[in-house]
Amino acid sequence: MTSSKIEMPGEVKADPAALMASLHLLPSPTLNLEIKHTKIFINNEWQNSESGRVFPVYNPATGEQICEIQEADKVDTDKAVRAARLAFSLGSVWRRMDASERGQLLDKLADLVERDRAVLATMESLNSGKPFLQAFYVDLQGVIKTLRYYAGWADKIHGMTIPVDGDYFTFTRHEPIGVCGQIIPWNFPLLMFAWKIAPALCCGNTVVIKPAEQTPLSALYMGALIKEAGFPPGVVNILPGFGPIVGAAIASHVGIDKIAFTGSTEVGKLIQEAAGRSNLKRVTLELGGKSPNIIFADADLDYAVEQAHQGVFFNQGQCCTAGSRIYVEESIYEEFVRRSVERAKRRVVGSPFDPTTEQGPQIDKKQYNKILELIQSGITEGAKLECGGKGLGRKGFFIEPTVFSNVTDDMRIAKEEIFGPVQEILRFKTVDEVIERANNSDFGLVAAVFTNDINKALTVSSAMQAGTVWINCYNALNAQSPFGGFKMSGNGREMGESGLREYSEVKTVTIKIPQKNS
């Protein structure tokens, strides 16, 4: 999710005609993809579930079953934790490994992802419904950059000496926490896998990770690459299964020292409660959002319209960062709405494997129904439906790009996270007013402001109650920058140097010495 726009080679232009003429330059999906990895991955081995249960995985573009996956449960979780604890034990290969070698393993994993980039992008597209070109150019690029970024950090994490009073020599060590439980969502399955494991492994931890039950395929494929890269057995263990069973077992397991979760605020609360009730494990939560995107009259209007469009419709609107509350200054409101509607009507919805497609299906029937219900609530509560608002086609879970105007702050569509292709456009008059309204939310993940006035930009960005603020851009996420939320959008930070702090403990060591000299 390094950019809200799919960045293609320079020879390939964005307009459909040029795109069609340049198809030979684009990567191609893997035809007749064979799903080889459908079992649980523990101790670098593929295992059946202890219960013998399996669950189906579907293609959201067609509603058809792709395959069946072994369903992990509490017993399998216990096995994975034992493997992770053994791999983390004092004197183990992993604990004795030089930090530089950990970095080399992460770099090797990045090499293997690059080698299999088309396969992984095909798998992401097939399993999650996102356009193949987005998966290839955005998601996979983010995976590779994240792995390489933390590979570079592995031998640069260190403590310091401290000039304490008295005849003592004091220094600090940054040590791995231990076994890390990680639970990832279905909207960016592979990218979130990398966001979670890369800093954890960089610091020397071991991992038990649960992919979303809707999208386990790419995570399981990564298990094979992790083994091929040379990570010791037990360092990474992958448990496909369901949140109330495996997710709950991870959150409450006393053998897990830290948990990281990306998903809904509702589930995040349950995880934090379970972590507290069990062994008070450390918790990092990246949760929901209802992000404000503020457009001032002095902004470049065409650019702001396109960025706002991508900011909410990217990845079928299934982004925690989606800029779904768009506040537009009154003097340009009507024109902004007109151009936004024109752009939404041009958005190409279709097969994820069609290179002209901008928007694929929603992830499943449950999410599809939730989005349509919230769209109906917007109509009922008096917002103006400018375009879209309905499902598309007989197969799959496609929804028309939808734009609402005349939205007010008290409407459900302005307060609740829709997680779908629905743009809500509100109007404002003054800077102070829009700051107060933008901050009047339980969430605080990201915010954005579009203006050519640096004073407005800095005033608004400093006032926003959000972990990330973008000025004249949107979805500008990078491996080097910390990411996380204020308020009910979570706690802790992922990515950047800050992400390392979530996976290490600082130990102070003090030695009595005969005499200290400066």
UniProtKB/Swiss-Prot annotation:
Pfam families reported in the protein's UniProt record: Aldedh
Biological or metabolic pathway of the protein: Cofactor metabolism; retinol metabolism
Gene3D superfamilies for this protein: Aldehyde Dehydrogenase, Chain A, domain 1, Aldehyde Dehydrogenase, Chain A, domain 2
Cellular compartments per GO CC: cytoplasm
Active site: E286 (proton acceptor), C320 (nucleophile)
GO BP: any one term: protein homotetramerization
PROSITE patterns attached to this UniProt entry: ALDEHYDE_DEHYDR_CYS (PS00070), ALDEHYDE_DEHYDR_GLU (PS00687)
MF (Gene Ontology): aldehyde dehydrogenase (NAD+) activity; all-trans-retinol dehydrogenase (NAD+) activity; retinal dehydrogenase activity
Domain of life per record: Eukaryota
Subcellular location: Cytoplasm
Reaction catalyzed: retinal + NAD(+) + H2O = retinoate + NADH + 2 H(+); all-trans-retinal + NAD(+) + H2O = all-trans-retinoate + NADH + 2 H(+); all-trans-13,14-dihydroretinal + NAD(+) + H2O = all-trans-13,14-dihydroretinoate + NADH + 2 H(+)
UniProt-listed Enzyme Commission number(s): 1.2.1.36
UniProt: NAD(+) binding residues: 184-186, 210-213, 264-266, 366-370, 417
Annotated site residue numbers, Transition state stabilizer: N187
Class of the enzyme per the UniProt entry, highest EC level: oxidoreductase
Keywords: Cytoplasm, Lipid metabolism, NAD, Oxidoreductase
Assembly information from the UniProt record: Homotetramer.
Family to which the UniProt record says this protein belongs: Belongs to the aldehyde dehydrogenase family.
Alphabetical list of PANTHER family matching this protein: ALDEHYDE DEHYDROGENASE-RELATED
Function noted in UniProt: Catalyzes the NAD-dependent oxidation of aldehyde substrates, such as all-trans-retinal and all-trans-13,14-dihydroretinal, to their corresponding carboxylic acids, all-trans-retinoate and all-trans-13,14-dihydroretinoate, respectively. Retinoate signaling is critical for the transcriptional control of many genes, for instance it is crucial for initiation of meiosis in both male and female. Recognizes retinal as substrate, both in its free form and when bound to cellular retinol-binding protein. Lacks activity with benzaldehyde, acetaldehyde and octanal.
Name of the protein in question: Retinal dehydrogenase 2
Gene: ALDH1A2
